[in-house]
């Protein structure tokens, strides 16, 4: 079916909740995707950070296919080997004690909020349930995680929203301290605010948050849905901050292309989550976990060294481009701020030349597969240089 027919059918029957690019992708390999008419794209979005090993990695595809031919689903009434195998790897890799599996980042963050409140209510009583998040954060689109998201643009509809969430400006420890009271149970943050503009938190601020949580016995939740599993050049972005959270959430790149969410809890918080406190019919699905095991196994020292090398190469090349004001993020989570052109216009022009990129507010956002080569980086920089070199100054446009 050609692209026009695919788009027409989608627009007729699929709920219009997405502002899609006018692109149909039919197949892919590595960093490259192809449309029905043979259009080829160099993908620096990786499905918003999901395809960590690129399209159709051979070992990943074989593991998923093999498991699908053995046993595709059981629910959590029974044990399956891929689930426990993945949980052990994640605990050993991160130092956490237990894992709960769901199907998305929003589900993982819901689970983290529930676990934090359960710990606090068990130890301090039923009123200690407030979670403080940061302004410009993004934690999901369920009612609870939408409420946790510190951006008013997401709070215009769907009310009434859940009670029990407050927002502190990122980087201001005094403002956070002022919000903490007897009803506070947790602080939840992204170390790099992805949807909020690819902005990394200051290390001193992060350590001050950890100290405050220790002093008040607040549960510290770090949302690594977008930053985790090698994206920043370490398995967790927490490693850049020498930070040990009470709860870490993962999703996106963990599954390598299949839906997964994970809540990693330390022993203190995990102890309160017994049978019946939480659940998921599809969580820990053996097919998904088979793929995730391949992803985690791939994240060895040499793999992460290449992530860091390519990040240095990419950032150095971007710094030489016209119109570039600043570069944000860590590793291969890259935000580009422009002086005088709109990120949305850059995105559209790149797409026309076969390079797929993202935006985050007024910034261009790059989330390439972690398997990229030096040649892939050179090709992307070549397109960006051509696009930006041809652009006239305009007023930047913010993207919701």
Language model features: what each stretch is:
Residues 1-400:
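Conserved N-terminal phosphate-binding loop of PLP-dependent enzymes in the Aspartate aminotransferase
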């Amino acid at each position: 079916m050609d692209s026009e027919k695919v788009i027409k059918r989608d627009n007729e029957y699929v709920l219009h909740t997405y502002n899609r690019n006018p692109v149909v992708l039919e197949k892919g390999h590595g960093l490259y995707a192809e449309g029905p008419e043979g259009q080829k794209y160099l993908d620096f979005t990786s499905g918003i950070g999901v395809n960590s090993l690129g399209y159709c990695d051979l070992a990943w595809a074989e593991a998923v296919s093999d498991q699908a031919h053995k046993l595709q689903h059981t629910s959590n009434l029974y044990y399956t080997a891929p689930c426990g195998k993945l949980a052990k790897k994640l605990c050993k890799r991160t130092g956490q004690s237990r894992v709960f599996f769901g199907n998305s980042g929003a589900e993982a963050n819901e689970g983290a909020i529930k676990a934090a409140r359960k710990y606090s209510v068990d130890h301090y009583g039923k009123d200690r349930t407030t979670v403080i998040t940061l302004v410009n954060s993004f934690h999901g689109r369920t009612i609870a995680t939408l409420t946790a998201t510190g951006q008013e643009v997401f709070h215009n509809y769907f009310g009434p929203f859940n009670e029990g969430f407050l927002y502190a400006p990122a980087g201001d420890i005094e403002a956070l301290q002022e919000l903490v009271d007897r009803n506070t149970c947790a602080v939840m943050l992204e170390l790099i605010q992805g949807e909020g503009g690819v902005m990394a938190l200051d290390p001193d601020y992060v350590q001050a948050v950890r100290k405050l949580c220790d002093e008040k016995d607040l549960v510290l939740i770090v949302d690594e849905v977008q930053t985790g599993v090698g994206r920043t050049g370490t398995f967790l972005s927490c490693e850049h901050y020498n930070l040990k959270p009470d709860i870490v959430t993962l999703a996106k790149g963990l599954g390598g292309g299949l839906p997964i969410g994970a809540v990693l809890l330390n022993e203190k918080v995990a102890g309160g989550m017994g049978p019946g406190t939480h659940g998921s019919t599809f969580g820990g699905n053996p097919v998904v976990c088979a793929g995730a095991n391949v992803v985690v196994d791939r994240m060895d020292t040499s793999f992460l060294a290449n992530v860091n090398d390519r990040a240095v190469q990419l950032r150095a090349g971007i710094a030489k481009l016209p119109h570039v004001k600043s570069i944000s993020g860590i590793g291969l989570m890259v935000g580009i701020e422009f002086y005088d052109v709109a990120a949305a216009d850059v995105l559209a022009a790149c797409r026309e030349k076969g390079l797929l990129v993202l935006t985050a507010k007024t910034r261009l956002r790059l989330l390439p597969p972690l398997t990229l080569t030096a040649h892939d980086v050179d090709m992307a920089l070549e397109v960006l240089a051509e696009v930006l070199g041809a652009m006239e100054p305009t007023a930047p446009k913010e993207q919701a």
